[in-house]
């Protein structure tokens, strides 16, 4: 299977509608919950574990929806949205790599550290996901370590992010 190694926002939104990958029913969230504007690189054999990498970016603008409500008079991007982006990208990697059809769900993570914040005057958030383990049995599970950088400064780190691909989510 020939795969792209970068994706535009339009292609990511096509994934939200179920139009990009014919082999899977996994989807990214639609706006406004899609937390990145583009995937700049995705490879199946990158990273220190040789399991693959995904790098993505979000352009920061003062008019992004979350700055208007979190918090009034003290706008900051909620930390959970950056963490969710890391799970979104881990799930996207599983679908991109040919994981069996399924619905992606975040399963947890081993450790999360926040050492900074995203303010409206920032310019760019970059996500760097490094796959550490892929289990491809009845249930497909991807595990990754991830960093989030704002204007080239690391502010979030997550270890052992886990995403599962479920044939049905009714009993989840």
UniProtKB/Swiss-Prot annotation:
GO biological process, any: unsaturated fatty acid biosynthetic process
Catalytic activity: a (3R)-hydroxyacyl-[ACP] = a (2E)-enoyl-[ACP] + H2O; (3R)-hydroxydecanoyl-[ACP] = (2E)-decenoyl-[ACP] + H2O; (2E)-decenoyl-[ACP] = (3Z)-decenoyl-[ACP]
Active site positions: 70
Enzyme nomenclature, EC number: 4.2.1.59, 5.3.3.14
Pathway: Lipid metabolism; fatty acid biosynthesis
Superkingdom per UniProt: Bacteria
Bridged cysteine pairs (disulfide): none
One Gene Ontology MF term: (3R)-hydroxyacyl-[acyl-carrier-protein] dehydratase activity
Gene Ontology cellular-component annotations: cytoplasm
One Pfam family linked to the record: FabA
Keywords: Cytoplasm, Fatty acid biosynthesis, Fatty acid metabolism, Isomerase, Lipid biosynthesis, Lipid metabolism, Lyase
Main location: cytoplasm
Subcellular location: Cytoplasm
SUPFAM superfamilies found in the cross-reference section: Thioesterase/thiol ester dehydrase-isomerase (SSF54637)
Family (UniProt): Belongs to the thioester dehydratase family. FabA subfamily.
PANTHER family according to UniProt: 3-HYDROXYACYL-[ACYL-CARRIER-PROTEIN] DEHYDRATASE, 3-HYDROXYDECANOYL-[ACYL-CARRIER-PROTEIN] DEHYDRATASE
Quaternary structure note: Homodimer.
Function of the protein: Necessary for the introduction of cis unsaturation into fatty acids. Catalyzes the dehydration of (3R)-3-hydroxydecanoyl-ACP to E-(2)-decenoyl-ACP and then its isomerization to Z-(3)-decenoyl-ACP. Can catalyze the dehydratase reaction for beta-hydroxyacyl-ACPs with saturated chain lengths up to 16:0, being most active on intermediate chain length.
The name this protein goes by in its record: 3-hydroxydecanoyl-[acyl-carrier-protein] dehydratase
Organism, scientific name: Xylella fastidiosa (strain 9a5c)
């Amino acid at each position: 299977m020939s795969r792209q190694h970068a994706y535009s926002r339009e292609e990511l939104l096509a994934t939200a509608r179920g139009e990009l990958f014919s082999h899977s029913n996994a989807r990214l969230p639609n706006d406004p919950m899609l937390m990145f504007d583009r995937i700049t690189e995705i490879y199946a054999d990158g990273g220190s574990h040789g399991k693959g990498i995904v790098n993505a970016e979000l352009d920061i603008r003062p008019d992004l929806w979350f700055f208007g409500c979190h918090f009034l008079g003290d706008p900051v991007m909620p930390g959970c949205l950056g963490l969710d982006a890391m799970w979104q990208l881990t799930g996207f990697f599983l679908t991109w790599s040919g994981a069996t059809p399924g619905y992606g769900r975040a399963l947890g993570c081993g450790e999360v550290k926040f050492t900074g914040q995203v303010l409206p005057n920032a310019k760019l958030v970059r996500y760097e996901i490094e796959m550490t383990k892929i289990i491809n049995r009845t249930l497909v599970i991807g595990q990754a370590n991830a960093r989030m950088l704002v204007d080239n400064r690391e502010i979030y780190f997550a270890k052992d992010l886990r995403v599962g691909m479920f044939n049905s989510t009714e009993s989840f």
